[in-house]
């Protein structure tokens, strides 16, 4: 249940998100001297009225067209959002499933053994969700997806 996350008061807040697992170590807003403020853009609660008022998305589009960035949408949002709120990890779990996880983000991660490399497993890649991530918590949902997938191709 994510109703607490979704129904929170957004007065004077542009967006709410969870700290990026890896970005919290590498990306910081040095101009505002905030160290742990780099949000992952995979799960965001957006206050569209405030975003229109501050023109955040227009500024983000401009920044992305003017400057090359790693993770351009996420980096620009983090750099330009002036009023953001940090939500608990459980609303965008990017690393490992925990008992309190409400939303798990299937994101690219880093692996260090047997050598440094990135690992990307998409949630619809059922075989790799099982074999690589060793996740079986979503088997009921993945079974439904597998049954419905052929119907999607018909339309």
Roles of regions detected by a PLM:
Residues 1-23, 45:
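GT-A fold catalytic core of metal-dependent nucleotide-sugar glycosyltransferases
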Residues 23-24, 97:
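Short, surface-exposed recognition loops and adjoining beta-strand edges that mediate ligand/DNA contacts
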Residues 28-34:
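Short, P/G- and charge-enriched loop/turn segments at secondary-structure junctions
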Residues 41, 46-155:
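A glycosyltransferase accessory/donor-loop signature
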